[in-house]
Amino acid sequence: MLRPGRARAIVALLVMLMVMLASCAQIPRSGPVGKSKDEGAGNPNAPVFFPAAPRAGSSPETVIEDFYMAGSGYEDDYPVARQYLTQAQSVTWKPDKRAIVFREAQVVKAAGENEYLYELDLAYSVDADGVATQFPPGTKETIPVTLEQVEGEWRISKVPDGTAIPEETFKVIYGANPIYFYDPTFTYAVPDYRWFIKKNTVKSMTSALLAGPAPYLRGAVVSAFPSGMKLARESVPVVSGAAQVDLSAKELFDASAEDRQRMQNQLALTFRNQPDVINVQLRADQDLVRVEDNGTVLPPVLDKSVPARQIAVNNGDLVRYENNRVTPLPDIQSVAGLGPHSPAESPVSQTAAFLNGDKTTLYSIEPGQPARQLTTRTTLTGPSFSPNDWVWTAGPGATGAAEVVAYKPTGSAPGAGIPSVTMTPAWLTGRTVKDFRVSREGTRALVISEANGKSAVQVTGIVRNPDGVPKDLTVPITLLSNSAADQGAWVNGSTVAVMSGSATSTVVPELLSLESGEPQQLAPWDGLTSISVGNGAEQIYGQSDAGIFQRVGNGWELQLKGPTEPAFPG
């Protein structure tokens, strides 16, 4: 059985060795023109571990423990870890298939002869394309391991592909990196965060990009690279700051000039945080392919911003809240008789939407027109607009099952039917949707739902038909939160703010990131009942009975008393 003290000591020793090496062996950032880095180009200060080789006389339990500890020695294809395997198993074992990250581990004897189980408290699982799945404490996974004696020493003869490493080691060796895809109109860039070994980042990112988006984004985003395009060689060298991406020639030459420009833009965005990469070269069988920029392809918008104004409710009617002033919404008729709550405003038009007083009916309103009823249900989430003017809400359908509905009221003539779509995702079966917020580029949605008293914060992809009409929601990813969140808002393209609102309790909002599995708690504040976010974490607003507050540093500062439920466009 793995002794926790021994495991911590080994991890501490390895981390200390890594730090010492990093401080003594900085890779130069300058050199002769034309100097090439190999396919491992990425972080020049990437940590290197030197795990211990097998020791004579080790027990089966120790061999299993040490084998998985040796998974930190990734350079040159895990040579030390392979020493713990029989010759046959060493040849077939594929460590890059999966990385299992654990909080605690122990070896237990299984029923069969020379068979053992490596029991883990699972923290993450990372697949071959760097897609990470996070698990809450207490999630168990068991790895079966079989050993045999080779020249009097125990060696592993059967083990699944992949590595299993402690969470502390994982956070040192691996880093989260966004690879970028497009929204279906090629207007916006959408981040898809992957976890890669820091030493091999550029090549790993390129392979993952060619393989396509993570499961929760499939169908919601598009790539400039056609399906089936591959690297022509298993490396992406960086020469004098240029990442040389050598692709299969036929697919590259078959692509239009516009598509090649989009390919280059997509790679440039993906490599933008890599310190060695200044620009990108597309190559076909090692020959440079020139990409002409004739101005017809615009770079995609990264981290789409929202206007500085907010919509709010004041004296029972819809108003605009901007620069700490309240003004009427331009050319919008009064809706005071409907008791508006949870207002939302389109980011691209003057259309607004809101719920009635008991939050059972959704209305939309356009300049110069009366409010129009869109749907009535036993309960509804506050409306949220996408950048193509669809307004979304969620609530129980006729059978009680959770439904997500979208309407496009903008431009519909008075009295005419309003286009609408109803979706009943299987993954929402048995759940009550508390909040539904479309991301600013329109390809994803933040979904907060509850079942059996437990809330889940998830991000789903929005699948659309070619004409832009919503069609489906993908199976989501889950972001771990420390609170029983019931509402949230997008902070930027990779972060959301969530909280459990309460007029009578102290509320602690959290920032949850696609990049990091650790929630960031914001300063607590009494009585926060709603939250809104502009452009970035410095523009977070909370509302309580005392007024509207803005996050300032590690606290909250009163902005204005009177208006309630402020919301930025979207």
Swiss-Prot record:
One of its GO terms (cellular component) is plasma membrane. It is found in: Cell membrane. Residues 1-23 form the signal peptide. The keyword Glycoprotein does not apply. Keywords: Cell membrane, Lipoprotein, Membrane, Palmitate, Signal. Its main location: membrane. A lipid is attached at C24 (N-palmitoyl cysteine). SMART domains: Germane. A lipid is attached at C24 (S-diacylglycerol cysteine). It is a lipid-anchor. InterPro entries: GerMN, Lipoprotein_LpqB, Lipoprotein_LpqB_C, Quino_amine_DH_bsu. The keyword Lipoprotein applies. Belongs to the LpqB lipoprotein family. This is Lipoprotein LpqB. It comes from Paenarthrobacter aurescens (strain TC1).
